[in-house]
Amino acid sequence: MNEIILIDAGTGNLRSVQKALENVGATVTRTDDPQKVLSASKIVLPGVGAFGDFMSGLRARGLDDAVKQAVSREVPMLGICVGMQALFEIGEEMGDHEGLGLLKGTVVRFADSLSVKIPHTGWNQLTVKNEALLFDQIQDGAYVYFNHSYYCQPWNSS
């Protein structure tokens, strides 16, 4: 496994993500330097907190443009939590905020009318809609842990 650039946008669970990656044999470099992101061969974008604050942290460090340029060169990237949400065009948490726009769609709050408690916290089953390398070793229906009040609504579900 090549070096993975772990982006530090000023918020996030960096240490736990770094340890998880190292546990599977990855060499990890934590950085908030756009130049390191631009030269990356793999990127992980973790995040915790509010969408708008997270995007402000990316922009203040010049990481938003660096991520977009890296992805345009087809550098593999994984977004975790708010890092995944940031890949979309708009996040609606505490007002509308512009995301990175790498994926078409919006990050929206779960409806209060749902019969589940929001935030959704706990173990639940995954439903894998499409085959993807990321889910290659994960069975449809596998249990994973969730802690969120918002979800990504892509414009195209494929």
Description of each model-found segment:
Residues 49-121:
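Cysteine-nucleophile active-site neighborhood
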Residues 1-5:
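Extreme N-terminal starter segment of soluble prokaryotic enzymes
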Residues 27, 42, 76-78, 143:
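Structural signature of beta-strand start/N-cap positions in the alpha/beta core
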Residues 37-47:
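Short acidic/histidine-rich motifs immediately flanking catalytic phosphotransfer sites
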Residues 11, 47-49:
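Short glycine-/small-residue-rich Rossmann-like dinucleotide-binding loops
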Residues 90-158:
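Pocket-forming structural segment of enzyme catalytic cores
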Residues 28-39:
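Short acidic low-complexity segments
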